[in-house]
Amino acid sequence: MERTFAIIKPDAVERNIVGKVLEKIEAAGFRIVGMKKIQLSKKEAEGFYYVHSERPFFGDLCSFMSRSPVVVLALERENAIAKWREVMGATNPANADAGTIRKEFGLSIEENTVHGSDSPESAAFEIPYFFSQLELL
């Protein structure tokens, strides 16, 4: 079994669609092994998204991710990373396939409802950034 990391972003939490996103996650065969609702500080968002620190959108991304609560998740299933990327859809909701979370719920390239690890290395950094081993089932 493989694990991946997901965030239900502020835009989705603000619109009260967390339950709908969780339904899609479970329907895709994921087991939720860790979940909590948190309020990121700007500094925590900057630490999490450090790989984008030189990109022009970094400041806006960190402000967005710290503007209101998010739900962080550790997910498990076979081929979890690739499957979660498939279920999320393209980063830009306008380019996402029908039936994906971002196509159904995303508002823009920034307010695109969810984040997901893009590699085993990312998941290995992202899961312990938010969860201790004791919090994972």
Curated annotation (Swiss-Prot):
UniProt xrefs under CDD domains: NDPk_I
Catalytic activity: a 2'-deoxyribonucleoside 5'-diphosphate + ATP = a 2'-deoxyribonucleoside 5'-triphosphate + ADP; a ribonucleoside 5'-diphosphate + ATP = a ribonucleoside 5'-triphosphate + ADP
EC class (word): transferase
InterPro entries registered for this protein in UniProt: NDK-like_dom (IPR034907), NDK-like_dom_sf (IPR036850), Nucleoside_diP_kinase (IPR001564), Nucleoside_diP_kinase_AS (IPR023005)
Pfam family, one: NDK
EC numbers for this chain: 2.7.4.6
Alphabetized UniProt keyword annotations: ATP-binding, Cytoplasm, Kinase, Magnesium, Metal-binding, Nucleotide metabolism, Nucleotide-binding, Phosphoprotein, Transferase
Cofactor: Mg(2+)
Assigned protein family: Belongs to the NDK family.
Full protein name: Nucleoside diphosphate kinase
Source lineage: Bacteria, Pseudomonadati, Thermodesulfobacteriota, Desulfuromonadia, Geobacterales
